[in-house]
Amino acid sequence: VSSDYAKIKSVTLRPVVKTRLPSSLIHVGPENGDSLATPVMPLIGENKGLMMDFDILEDEIRPLQWRIIHCDRNWRKSNLVESEYMTVVDCDFLIDGDFADFSYNTTVPYVHYDFYFPFHGGSSTPEIRFLMSGNYVVQVYEQVYEGEDEYAYESDIVLIQKRFVVTEQLVEIQAEIKRPNLVQYMDDSQQISMKIVPHGFDLSTFDKDLYVVYRQNGRWDNTICGIQPNHVSGDGSLVFNDNRNALFKGGNEFRNFHFKSLRIATTPVDYIEKNDGKYFVYLHPDRDWHAAYTSTTDLNGNFLTSEDTHNNADYCADYADVKFTLPYHRNYYDTLDLYVFGGFNDWKLNDENKMTYNSRLQQIGNIF
């Protein structure tokens, strides 16, 4: 992360941090507990805020802190000062032992942290509210001292940063997903058509002031941005229709598995073993899905933390190594790379989730 937070992404920046729930195993969502909801909150009205929770794989509590950063439409740190978008400025929001729980009866020790924002405050904690809508990032960091003796200086080490959005209902948005009109995209893509009804809101300079962002199932990695309307209707509404740039590939259904219990192997888990005090979950060899499409219910690439034995998965669920296998014949000229990816790693294709080829004509993947 550069000094000006250029193009702030949702990431886990330190390898010691392992987080859970949607997006990079970090959960930022409504405080009502809907773990699959998109982290969006209204500026006005019943503002119940958001919750962030994560795990750090160690057996002691760190004195962490968090802060809010306002971003422009391109997710770069804006030029606004804190007092322009928040009611509280220059305040260190601590994540101490009151916001942390040690894991219970797990093979992998971890500390589970969670906190809510904004909050109403208390006798010693000021209230925090947002003053404007827009793009925001919540950062979790720790302060460390570098150097020695009188030459020591304080430095912020950012562990996690996640995006969220504060909204205002200034216009009416009418949108639908339909089959593309263009023949070459009919069988593999989905088209978004949209109409923005101003209801008195000034959209006369939409070419400069309006910036449209389409997201597929809450993802940030494949957003479609900057789409312009096809025409303006008589009532001033902006119509976005039949635009080949507003297409998402339909893809296929996501593969599903769960190991809520590490004692019983459930479909599609082949078997579970425990070696050196650690669990290993082996999935049945998968198959290529180049076949007739069948609809299945899934989480659109996201995941939930759950555990059958105890009442609270936040600190009772265990970690395991999961082994993925895809039978695949690789030719000498084949340069295809295969990955296991989804919400658990923020939809990133990297070396950690890249599958490797072995002599048994299989692609092998391992995710912890």
Model region roles, listed by residue range:
Residues V89-F119, W220-S233, K323-F368:
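Aromatic-rich carbohydrate-binding modules that target alpha-glucans
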Residues L203-T294:
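Long, internal scaffold/assembly segments composed of regular secondary structure
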Residues Y282-L336:
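Basic K/R-rich, polyanion-interacting modules in nucleoproteins and related proteins
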